[in-house]
């Protein structure tokens, strides 16, 4: 029961024992009000303490005190891991749910320093090891200025990334590896009969190509995507080509029956935890949207929730972003490197996020993929889906032409130095997913 006079808990059955008060004062020389200890096996109790040393369990109380100390120590040790791991990557954002103007100014100052390094001619001429050293030096200076969190810098040489955490808690990175070089190759042309047949197709849905490989200026890649957009639009698939892809654009992917992610990807590893450091690794889709003050404010919640990351001063998104942002029931085809992770660490986070938002099916690649291989696979797959095939049928057809992985294709082109690990397509969701069918049952039966 709570004693309202002094706020302590007492034993109502012995609270009126005057002898107990006297004995207690003789024992420790002071009032015991409000002090607690273990209960003895025998003897009257007041305020959770034995009445005194004379026959009231003083000898028994000493080991009890020791037990209490040990219990408290054990509880503290038990609580430490809980506290150390309490701030998981997702939960860190809960501490702060919006960016202030001061936060954004700090990030912009850090981004300016990072991009000054990564956009320099000296950086382009450096080896990966030299880039890592330069990145670490830059981040050390930013840490000294209070713009980067102390102890947050992590070097992932295997995946060509140096990650860090801004002082506000958002995640950032410096990419030190170059993306796969473009090996220009013309798209295979369809036969005249096929062109005529496809030209007679009715509308088979809508599509969007999210092109962020480059800024399209003097680009070796862009003309192929412009051709695909024009061609698909002419044969029944109403196609939009987005060459200035933003985080906001990706939020509207659910408006289309087919979405194509034509951009670079990366594997991002970062550290978290304040006592015992832990690492987390995830695939990222890299955009060409440069960070600025107002965009940081607009994307502030996603940045703090670690759904959006800034790499080389530009935005990138992960699987949690799609889980939060995608709302649709379309098909998603990705050309990005490591969309499904890599050998030994296949990661379905991207696809899982899209499927959680309602996507019918997702296709992407494990490992770094040759851009010409992924583009050729895309071309063949979409053309077959326009003809009415399922996603699985269309992908199998593309594999029959270009090979089941990109090293097979590379060797058939006469290549002599393939990259380390073959890239291959993976499917998630409904393998029987198709584009909208514009034909009635009678028309389909007549065509058969």
Language-model regions, residue ranges each:
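Short, positively charged and aromatic/hydrophobic N-terminal segments
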Residues: 3, 10-11, 27, 45-47, ...
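Bacterial N-terminal signal peptides
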Residues: 69-79
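Sec-dependent signal peptide cleavage junction
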Residues: 79-90
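Short Lys/Arg-enriched alpha/beta "domain-start" segment
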Residues: 91-146
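A domain-level signal for caspase-like cysteine endopeptidase catalytic cores
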Residues: 99, 103-119, 185-290, 300
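Structured catalytic cores of large enzymes
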Residues: 141-203, 341
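Cysteine protease catalytic core and zymogen-processing segment of caspase-like enzymes
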Residues: 268-361
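Active-site-proximal C-terminal subdomain of hydrolase catalytic domains
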Residues: 331-447
């Amino acid at each position: 029961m709570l004693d309202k006079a002094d706020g302590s808990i007492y034993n109502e059955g012995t609270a009126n024992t005057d002898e107990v008060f006297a004995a207690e004062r003789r024992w420790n020389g002071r009032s015991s009000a409000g002090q607690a200890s273990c209960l003895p096996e025998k003897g009257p109790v007041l305020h959770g303490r034995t009445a005194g040393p004379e026959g009231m369990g003083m000898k028994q109380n000493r080991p009890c005190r020791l037990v209490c100390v040990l219990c408290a120590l054990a509880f503290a040790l038990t609580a430490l891991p809980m506290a150390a791991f309490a701030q998981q990557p997702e939960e860190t954002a809960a501490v702060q749910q919006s960016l202030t103007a001061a936060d954004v100014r700090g990030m912009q100052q850090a981004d300016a320093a990072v991009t000054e390094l990564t956009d320099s001619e000296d950086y382009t001429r450096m080896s990966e090891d030299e880039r890592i050293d330069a990145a670490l030096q830059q981040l050390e200076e930013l840490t000294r200025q209070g713009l980067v969190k102390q102890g947050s810098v992590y070097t992932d040489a295997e995946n060509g990334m140096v990650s860090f955490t801004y002082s506000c808690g958002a995640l950032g990175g410096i990419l030190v590896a170059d993306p796969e070089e473009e090996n220009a190759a013309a798209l295979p042309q369809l036969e005249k009969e096929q062109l005529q047949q496809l030209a007679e197709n009715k509308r088979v849905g809508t599509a969007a190509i999210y092109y962020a490989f480059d800024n399209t200026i003097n680009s070796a890649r862009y003309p192929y995507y412009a051709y695909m957009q024009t061609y698909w639009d002419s044969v029944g698939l109403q196609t939009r080509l987005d060459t200035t892809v933003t985080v906001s654009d990706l939020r509207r992917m659910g408006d289309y029956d087919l979405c194509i992610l034509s951009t670079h990807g990366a594997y991002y590893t970062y550290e978290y935890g304040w006592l015992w450091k832990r690492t987390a690794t995830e695939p990222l889709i890299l955009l060409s949207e440069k960070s600025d003050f107002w965009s940081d404010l607009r994307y502030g919640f996603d940045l703090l929730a670690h759904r959006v990351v800034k790499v080389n001063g530009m935005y990138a998104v992960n699987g949690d972003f799609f889980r939060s942002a995608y709302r649709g029931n379309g098909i998603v085809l990705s050309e990005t490197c490591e969309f499904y992770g890599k050998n030994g660490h296949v990661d379905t986070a991207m696809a899982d996020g899209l499927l959680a938002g309602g996507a019918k099916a997702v296709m992407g690649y494990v490992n770094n993929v040759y851009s010409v291989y992924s583009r050729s696979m895309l071309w063949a797959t979409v053309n077959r889906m326009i003809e009415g095939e399922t996603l699985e049928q269309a992908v199998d057809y593309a594999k029959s032409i270009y090979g089941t992985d990109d090293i097979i294709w590379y060797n058939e082109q006469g290549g002599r130095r393939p990259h380390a690990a073959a890239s291959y397509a993976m499917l998630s969701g409904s393998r029987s997913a198709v584009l909208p069918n514009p034909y009635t049952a009678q028309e389909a039966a007549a065509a058969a």
